[in-house]
């Protein structure tokens, strides 16, 4: 698949049903997914005006944690996940976080490879983290 440039924007209330559907396609969505979408900082990747993925972030002391990062199956291998991750990194730096963290189950080899390939290292059981530069602002 070719690289597709996504427009990344903040979550809007009318995104909830579509993003819940995206989460359902990946690992099954539930009431926790709704809570994440309603309470956390969520950014949506749009391709040609339609949501192609999202990342949900929450503060964890001096770190920013990726709670969910999903890409629509029809947009896999187009760079959408990488763009969302880069956006999450930038947001975390702007919020003065020192680390970006994500919990990944040991059997999720694809996700482990994705994050490790972008510089994340082991920080605990199922926890990966990326040390961030200081914000210059």
Each predicted region: which residue ranges?
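Conserved GNAT acetyl-CoA-binding A-motif
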Residues: 92-103
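Conserved active-site alpha-helix within GNAT-family acetyltransferase domains
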Residues: 82, 94, 106-124, 130
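Accessory recognition modules or surfaces
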Residues: 82, 135-137
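Conserved G/P- and acidic residue-centered "switch" motifs that form tight phosphate/ATP-binding loops
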Residues: 79
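Acetyl-CoA-dependent GNAT
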Residues: 2-67, 72-74, 85-87, 91, ...
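Conserved beta-strand-loop-alpha-helix junction that forms the acyl-donor binding cleft
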Residues: 73-76, 102-111, 128-135
């Amino acid at each position: 698949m070719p690289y597709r440039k996504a427009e990344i924007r903040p979550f809007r209330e009318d995104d909830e049903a579509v993003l819940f559907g995206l989460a359902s396609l990946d690992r099954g969505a539930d009431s926790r997914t709704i809570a994440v979408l309603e309470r956390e900082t969520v950014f949506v990747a749009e391709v040609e005006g339609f949501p192609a993925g999202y990342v949900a972030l929450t503060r964890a002391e001096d770190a920013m944690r990726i709670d969910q990062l999903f890409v629509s199956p029809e947009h896999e291998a187009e760079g959408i996940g990488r763009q969302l991750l880069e956006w999450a990194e930038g947001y975390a730096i702007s919020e003065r976080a020192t680390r970006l963290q994500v919990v990944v189950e040991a059997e999720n080899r694809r996700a482990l490879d994705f994050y490790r390939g972008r510089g994340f290292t082991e920080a605990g059981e199922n926890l990966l983290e990326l040390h961030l530069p200081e914000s210059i602002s």
